[in-house]
Design a protein with these regions (language model features):
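Bacterial N-terminal signal peptides that target proteins for export
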Residues: 2-15
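Subset of outer-membrane beta-barrel
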Residues: 27-272
Length: 272
């Protein structure tokens, strides 16, 4: 009886989300801070999860490791889990990341190697991204290697511009003839005397309409920050907060999809 109920639950889940296919893809942008700011992460300087956003803005100040989890729409089967680590060196910043989405019926795994450097006012980064998808039972699997690039610059004090492009080599899973997601984005951020940060992105996935993303971070009290954001295509709203010290930080956010409901995300960072 329990197995039958579990099977019916799986079937219902597949039917419901099969009706809204554009929402089934794993999150490409990681981190609860970015989630709380509407995923407008293309131009946030020193963003801890820049390896999954714009690699040109990897943190150059400290070595860091972090862990992130997101439960999409409250379903355990649609969970994103990821980890990241970065180390500044004399030759630039090296970074390594891992991301997994899904369950035993369908899963997507990404392993990312990133590098960032700068020349005068220009910051640039590149990521080699191995993607692997697996279908349950004997339905097969596939892998592909993608290449992401990003650039960024500080136009004026606390005013940043960034741009990125994912999978510029047009990779595809050979055995199943499926292309990886390809996305281009440009973004701006402006910091207001350490009291607030405004972020705005324009993102175009080749499969979907243009998405506009905006976010705001406000310093509430010492070491505590509040965040709100909005994303279009699909329409979603988000809010969250972050608290941190010199050696660690903690971030939490909730995203509300216009049709599918709430997705809570949490991350924890350590700095060395």
């Amino acid at each position: 009886m329990i197995r039958i109920q579990h099977l019916l639950y799986k079937i219902s889940l597949s039917v419901v989300f099969g009706l809204i296919t554009s929402s089934l893809f794993a999150q490409l942008t990681m981190g609860a801070k970015g989630l709380g700011m509407g995923q407008a992460t293309t131009a946030i300087p020193g963003y801890e999860w820049a390896l999954f956003a714009n690699p040109a803005l990897l943190n150059s100040d400290n070595a860091a490791i972090g862990f992130y989890g997101l439960r999409n729409y409250g379903f355990a089967e649609l969970t994103d889990m990821s980890a990241t680590g970065s180390v500044p060196t004399k030759l630039g910043v090296a970074a390594l990341g891992f991301h997994r989405y899904g369950d035993n019926l369908f899963s997507e795994t990404r392993i990312r190697f990133g590098y960032k450097n700068d020349w005068q006012m220009l910051h640039f980064g590149v990521v080699a991204n191995y993607n692997h998808i697996s279908f349950g039972a004997d339905y097969g699997s596939g892998g592909a290697l993608g290449l992401d690039v990003g650039i960024a610059a500080e136009l004026a004090e606390d005013l940043w511009i960034g741009a990125r492009s994912t999978n510029v080599n047009h990779p595809e899973y050979g055995d199943i003839d499926e292309e990886l997601a390809r996305e281009m984005a440009i973004g701006f951020t402006y910091g207001l005397n350490e009291l607030a940060v405004f972020a705005f992105d324009v993102v175009k996935d080749v499969r979907f309409p243009v998405s506009y993303r905006g976010g705001l971070e406000i310093a509430v009290i010492e070491d505590l920050k509040g965040r709100v954001g909005i994303t279009t295509e699909p329409l979603s709203y988000s809010l969250g907060f972050g608290y941190g010290k010199d050696r660690w930080s903690f971030n939490f956010a909730v995203q509300k999809h216009e049709l599918l409901g709430f997705s809570p995300g949490i991350d924890f960072m350590l700095y060395f």
